[in-house]
């Protein structure tokens, strides 16, 4: 199965990038930011993103729209300080592009200023590793 990993972050903390790189290490794949278009079809696109102003960043939307013909299914992995998931926002864009979005999702808290200090932490990454095992099955 061809799996690709793409992420977007604008945070100075780099929580989303850390999560994407962790996934890449565990799956033996390179995690690239969304400025890198897909070069070939991906049966599963692991999309690592974060909540910004109650939505996903426009870079995520542009990436999905620009690569819709190469994506067979999106798996949403996200973090936020607010505790809100990006699933609905990603689903809206996927629906517009006729890209299936897996019901499997991983969401974790992320630190921002004084909120959720130290997150994602070791326990979060352990849960993420367990989640990754479910998508490989």
Model feature map: region roles:
Residues 3-6, 11-30, 34, 41-137:
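FMN-binding flavodoxin-like domain, especially the glycine-rich phosphate-binding loop
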């Amino acid at each position: 199965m061809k799996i690709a990993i793409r992420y977007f972050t604008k945070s100075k903390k780099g929580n989303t990038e850390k999560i994407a790189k962790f996934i890449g290490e565990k799956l033996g794949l390179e995690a690239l930011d969304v400025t890198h278009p897909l070069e070939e079809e991906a049966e599963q696109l692991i999309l690592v993103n974060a909540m910004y102003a109650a939505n996903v960043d426009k870079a995520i939307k542009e990436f999905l729209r620009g690569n819709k013909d190469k994506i067979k299914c999106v798996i949403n992995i996200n973090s936020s300080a607010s505790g809100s998931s990006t699933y609905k926002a990603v689903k809206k864009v996927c629906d517009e592009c006729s890209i299936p979005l897996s019901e499997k999702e991983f969401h974790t808290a992320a630190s921002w200023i004084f909120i959720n200090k130290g997150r994602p932490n070791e326990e979060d990454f352990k849960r993420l590793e367990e989640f990754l095992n479910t998508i490989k099955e």
